[in-house]
């Protein structure tokens, strides 16, 4: 079978603050297909295999591996079905729950759980916004399931009767992921991915209580205990059933139970424990066996003759569960991958005993016993055993479906117009097969074929499965009625097949993303233009003026936000969140994620990763509040500049190719600050010791420990220069002192550069040029330079004894805003000064104390936001207050009520971004304060994930982009992923966002 497409990628590589050199993944249910052996009503044994790769549930003959039947779905099937009375119940990422007769695969019923929105991109696959990411459980006469991952978009807990009729439905505030469990006490236990499980009442869906957990989707019930994990450190913990008391912790990813015992496996040993003693809080080990197994485990047999099967890399071990004696180790070829899941069936009327294993590369293996009842060593392949073969660009595809030369030529012209070879493509027509085959061989696009009816869809799916392309490169969707199943602005390429198109251009063009291509049925090629006037986030704080406002009118006018895509860049390549790394960037067709030592190009329309560029050694700079931006995008989003150690790099932002570089050309200097506008680059040079660039753990620890304290040193440069965008020199200025990067701001329209220059002798003689602000202020000047020639337009002595922690400059419409802070009695006090653009003379000054106490989560280094609201007025959002930019007087933001202050509803590290009437920040979750909202609570938690510790929520291009930045987080957030939301206008709310109401049972049980 094709290699599984797991729902989530690799975890972060560790956590500096927690001294973890690795972090275990917590959601691994679909790392491999989960086999299930079950008998139908006649006693016939079926091997059921769900596929997360090619979107189906298979029934195979466990003796031969031949297919009995299959049920195709509209998305990945990630969980094994539940079986009751010869019926299999399961869900899929298409948001539907199905009941299928086991004997012949007949569909008994099918229900969509959520509102049935158009499909979005989820980790590279087109799925429902409300995927079924739990198992479907049959218990207490009901069928239970959960749909959705994002409470802001609706997550639903439902119960159907066994005929598919809705019994109850609840909208919940959790992100449900994992196998549902039940007891005879009318309770259903629900895992929530990386977070903690909870219990609900099976009668009406009421939430009863949370269960403590180290976090993770593994859960197991015994009569007296609840087991949950694996947490960050691969440990499963046991609790009393109500979760009131933790009993024991076991170093293991999986636990099996039976016959009054439990068995654990951790990669070095398998151990057996007395379950009754565990319930009393005693970890009594009955036996242990050295073993590399750490994946799935099964216990089978009679209570006095139990057998244990354990999966690991390269083998399945068969152990006497009573004594720990290794009976046999069943070898698995290494190129088959790691054995993850197991299924076993005892001998019965349907045939002999069989053991089944699946691997993370998609292999499905079966062993049959010898006459003695011991599994033999003959390996029988129950399905195609080799990993999929993907055609490389330029390799001819299926000869039997060679397209006409005219189609080949038209497709070549269309793909030449693409901004990137990667992305999503849609092919529609009465016979799309040839065009899809051609695009498979010539591009890297994920291709969607649109079928007119189920018969055509089934035929196309079988063809591409036979080519081992289905799910990996190609999927087929059926057009149901007039409504497209996809979100708009999603596809990079849409193809109308010549002479066979059944859709009009005005139906297809909305599906094409800006910059994407539509190929007409007559061969004409049309590129979709970009909308004008949308905002961008090209520099660290949006633009070189450092306003932290992208000016995006669509995001700023939003009444709500709709999920567009999630997935893509995950935590494994991102810097430790505590390092407060640089912001992501986005303009036009590009998004740039500044990962740990690499730049990653992402398509903002659908989350496709386009490229990765490895930066020179020690280019990655940390602790952004004390530094400044060193990577920026051009206004059209087509090129990206990066000041990397000894060179400034110019890259193609759409392809990741190096176009040009500029050496530093000065001994013992490195490139520092960088900004770009019009035809110019503003650059600085610094000492190699100035930035925080260490790669060793001991030094990095100071970035987390020391640099979250007060009065930390700022990164400074010694020279400033301006070049053309082609790196041609215009002018350079040897500074009269040191230039802290946070104090640099540039207005390319007005032609001015503003900076703070520290000229004291102690600064000039400093050895590292990483200097505390109080020392910089000993003899500091605010300087304004002419951008054209570098001449000093004016300078003013800057006397500011209160400036202790941080320094920011912003070029606002009303003047130059300087921000600093000091720490007093456990609280941050902020100081602001507005000065004239033309003279540097003071206009106003103010100070305020932060409303929250504490100085260990960055409370003293918040960056202010200069917000141009929808009424056209610019206001200073200096947390927690709002000020008139012109006078410095306190005021109300447009849309807010009297006595307003910004009080984030949750943990408040990180700083603000915004546009229009919307503010974005961390409040435990990525949160929007929507001042357009007519709701009583204007705050919306967009996702059950953790934002970064500085800025990673950026409004740009008519989208709200939230690339992953929580790497190293060990807390219990359900999701850890990149996100994109689209703004929804007030007039579109009813059509674009629908939240289903709760439905309660008709006959509620009497209260207990």
Ranges and model annotations:
Residues 468-481:
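Conserved SAM-binding strand-loop segment of SAM-dependent methyltransferases
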Residues 482-493:
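A short acidic, Gly/Pro-enriched loop at the edge of an enzyme's catalytic core
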Residues 1-37, 44-50, 56, 61, ...:
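Aromatic (tryptophan-biased) beta-strands that constitute blades/sheets of beta-rich domains
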Residues 420-438, 446-448:
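Conserved class I S-adenosyl-L-methionine
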Residues 503-516:
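A short glycine-rich, Lys/Arg-flanked "PGG" loop and its adjoining helix->strand segment in the class I
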Residues 26-57, 71-97, 124-158, 170-198, ...:
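Repeat-blade elements of multi-bladed beta-propeller folds
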Residues 460-461:
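Conserved SAM-binding loop
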Residues 449-454:
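Conserved acidic E/D residue at the C-terminus of a beta-strand in Rossmann-like folds
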């Amino acid at each position: 079978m094709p290699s599984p497409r797991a729902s989530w990628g690799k975890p972060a590589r560790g956590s500096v603050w927690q001294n973890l050199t690795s972090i275990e993944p917590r959601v691994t249910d679909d790392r491999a297909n989960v086999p299930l052996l079950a008998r139908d009503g006649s006693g016939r044994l079926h091997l059921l295999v769900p596929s997360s790769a090619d979107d189906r549930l298979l029934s195979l003959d466990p003796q031969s591996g031949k297919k009995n039947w299959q049920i195709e779905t509209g998305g990945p099937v990630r969980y094994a079905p539940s079986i009751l009375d010869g019926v299999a119940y399961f869900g899929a990422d298409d948001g539907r729950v199905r009941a299928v007769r086991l004997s012949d695969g007949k569909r008994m019923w099918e229900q969509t759980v959520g509102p049935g929105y158009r499909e979005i991109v989820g980790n590279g696959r087109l799925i429902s916004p409300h995927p079924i990411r739990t198992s479907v459980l049959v218990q207490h006469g009901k069928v239970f399931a959960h749909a959705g991952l994002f409470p802001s978009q609706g997550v639903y807990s439902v119960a159907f009767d066994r005929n598919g009729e809705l019994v109850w439905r609840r909208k919940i505030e959790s992100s449900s992921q994992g196998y549902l469990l039940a007891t005879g006490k009318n309770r259903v236990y629900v895992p929530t991915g990386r977070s903690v499980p909870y219990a609900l009442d099976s009668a009406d869906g009421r939430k009863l209580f949370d269960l403590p957990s180290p976090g993770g989707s593994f859960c197991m019930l015994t009569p007296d205990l609840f087991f949950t994990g694996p947490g960050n450190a691969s440990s499963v913990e046991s609790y009393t059933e109500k979760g009131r008391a933790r009993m024991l912790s076991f170093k293991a990813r999986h636990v099996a139970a039976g016959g009054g015992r439990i068995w654990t496996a951790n990669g070095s040993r398998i151990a057996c424990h007395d379950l009754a003693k565990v319930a009393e809080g005693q970890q009594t080990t009955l036996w242990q066996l050295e073993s590399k197994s750490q994946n799935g485990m099964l216990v089978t047999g009679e209570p006095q003759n139990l057998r244990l099967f354990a999966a690991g890399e390269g083998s399945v071990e068969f152990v006497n569960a009573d004594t720990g004696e290794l009976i046999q180790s069943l070898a698995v070829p290494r190129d088959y991958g790691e054995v993850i899941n197991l299924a076993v069936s005892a001998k019965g009327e349907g045939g002999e005993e069989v053991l089944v294993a699946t691997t993370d590369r998609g292999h499905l293996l079966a062993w049959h016993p010898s006459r003695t009842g011991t599994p033999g060593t003959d390996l029988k392949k129950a399905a195609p055993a080799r990993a999929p073969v993907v055609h490389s660009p330029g390799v001819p595809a299926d000869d039997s479906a060679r397209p006409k030369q005219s189609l080949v030529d038209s497709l070549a012209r269309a793909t030449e117009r693409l901004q990137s070879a990667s992305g999503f493509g849609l092919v529609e027509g009465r016979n799309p097969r040839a065009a899809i085959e051609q695009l498979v061989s010539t591009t890297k696009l994920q291709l969607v074929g649109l079928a007119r009816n189920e018969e055509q869809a089934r035929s196309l799916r079988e063809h591409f499965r036979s080519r081992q392309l289905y799910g990996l490169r190609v999927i087929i969707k059926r057009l149901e009625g007039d409504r497209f199943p996809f979100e708009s602005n999603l596809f990079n390429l849409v193809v109308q097949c010549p002479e066979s198109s059944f859709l009009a251009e005005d139906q297809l063009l909305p599906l094409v993303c800006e910059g994407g291509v539509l190929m007409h049925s007559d061969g004409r090629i049309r590129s979709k233009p970009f909308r004008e006037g949308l905002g961008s986030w090209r520099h660290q704080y949006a633009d070189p003026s450092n306003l932290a406002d992208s000016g995006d009118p669509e995001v700023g006018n939003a009444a709500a936000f709709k999920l567009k895509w999630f997935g893509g860049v995950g935590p494994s390549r991102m810097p430790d969140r505590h390092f407060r790394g640089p912001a992501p960037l986005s303009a036009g067709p590009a998004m740039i994620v500044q990962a740990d030592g690499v730049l990653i190009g992402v398509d903002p329309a659908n989350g496709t990763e386009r490229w990765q560029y490895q930066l020179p050694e020690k280019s990655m700079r940390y602790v952004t509040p004390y530094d400044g931006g060193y990577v920026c995008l051009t206004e059209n989003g087509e090129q990206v500049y990066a000041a990397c150690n000894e060179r400034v790099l110019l890259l193609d932002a759409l392809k990741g190719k190096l176009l040009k570089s500029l050496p530093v050309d000065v001994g013992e200097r490195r490139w520092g600050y960088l900004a770009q506008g019009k035809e110019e680059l503003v650059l600085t040079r610094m000492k190699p010791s100035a930035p925080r660039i260490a790669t060793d753990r001991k030094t990095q620890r100071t970035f987390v420990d020391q640099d979250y304290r007060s009065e930390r040193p700022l990164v400074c440069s010694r020279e400033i220069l301006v070049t053309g965008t082609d790196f041609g020199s215009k002018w350079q200025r040897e500074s009269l002192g040191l230039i802290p990067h946070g104090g640099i701001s540039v207005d390319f329209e007005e032609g001015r550069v503003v900076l703070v220059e520290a000229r004291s002798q102690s600064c000039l003689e400093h050895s590292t040029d990483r200097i505390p602000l109080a020392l910089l202020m000993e003899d500091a000047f605010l300087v304004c330079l002419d951008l054209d020639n570098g001449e000093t337009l004016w300078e003013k002595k800057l006397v500011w004894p209160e400036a202790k922690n941080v320094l920011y400059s912003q070029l606002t419409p009303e003047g130059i805003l300087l921000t600093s802070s000091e720490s007093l009695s456990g609280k941050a006090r902020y100081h602001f000064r507005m000065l004239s653009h033309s003279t540097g003379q003071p206009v106003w000054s103010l100070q305020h104390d932060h409303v929250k106490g504490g100085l260990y989560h960055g409370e003293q280094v918040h960056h202010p936001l200069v917000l141009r609201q929808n009424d056209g007025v610019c206001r200073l959002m200096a947390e927690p207050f709002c000020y008139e930019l012109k006078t410095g007087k306190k005021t109300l933001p447009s849309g807010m009520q009297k006595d307003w202050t910004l009080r984030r509803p949750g943990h408040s590290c990180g700083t603000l971004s915004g546009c229009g009437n919307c503010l974005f920040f961390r409040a435990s979750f990525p949160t929007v304060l929507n001042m357009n909202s007519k709701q009583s609570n204007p705050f919306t938690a967009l996702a059950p994930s953790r934002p970064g510790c500085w800025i990673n929520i950026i409004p740009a291009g008519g989208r709200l982009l939230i690339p992953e930045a929580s790497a190293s987080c060990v807390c219990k957030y359900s999701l850890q992923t990149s996100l994109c939301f689209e703004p929804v206008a007030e007039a579109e709310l009813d059509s674009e966002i629908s939240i289903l109401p709760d439905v309660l049972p008709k006959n509620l049980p009497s209260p207990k």
